[in-house]
C-alpha cells in the first residue's frame, strides 16, 4: 500500500486502515502547519485517499482533527484509578499534561478556539470529548465523597471545575511560567483537596 506525501510518494510502514492514515495525517499536518493551515485537501494529498471518501465520514477538517485528538488523548492519557482520589487525579492529570505539552496541545488550542464560533464543532467537543471524560472524573469525586476524602455536601461538578479550570487556563492562555508541569499539577491537586477535606482531617 502506498501513501502520497506532498512532493513525493512513500511506501507505508506496515498495515494501516484508511481511518488510521487519515488520523495520522491530520496530526502530522496539524503539527507542521498549525490548525489554520489544515485542510481536507491537504489530508487527502498526504494519504492518497479521495476527498469524497473522507467527507463520507467527516463533514469538515475540524471534525477530522477532533477525532484524531480524541483518539490520541484516549491513548496517551487514560483515566487512572489509584488508591485514593487525590492520587487518581494527580496521575490522570499528569498524563494529560504530558500529552498537552506535546503535539496534541499545539493542535488542540486553536481547535477549542474555533469551537467557540462553530456550533457544530462545539457540540461535538462537548459530547464526544468533554462529557465522557468528565463523567468518569465525576464518578471519582463521588467515590471520594463516599470514602470521606472530601467533605460531605460538595457538588462534584464544582470540584471538577476547581481542578480542571486552572489546568485548561494554562493550556489556553499563554503567560510566563504557565506550563502544565508535573509540579504544577501536584500543587493544584494538593491545594484543591486540602481545601475540601472534612474538618479535622
Labelled PLM ranges:
Residues 1-48, 52, 63:
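Basic, helix-initiating cap at the start of DNA-binding domains
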Residues 77-106, 159:
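Hydrophobic alpha-helical connector segments
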Residues 98-106, 110, 120-146, 157:
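Amphipathic alpha-helical packing segments from all-alpha helical-bundle domains
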Residues 123, 127, 131, 145-191, ...:
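Hydrophobic/aromatic-rich alpha-helical bundle segments in the mid-to-C-terminal region
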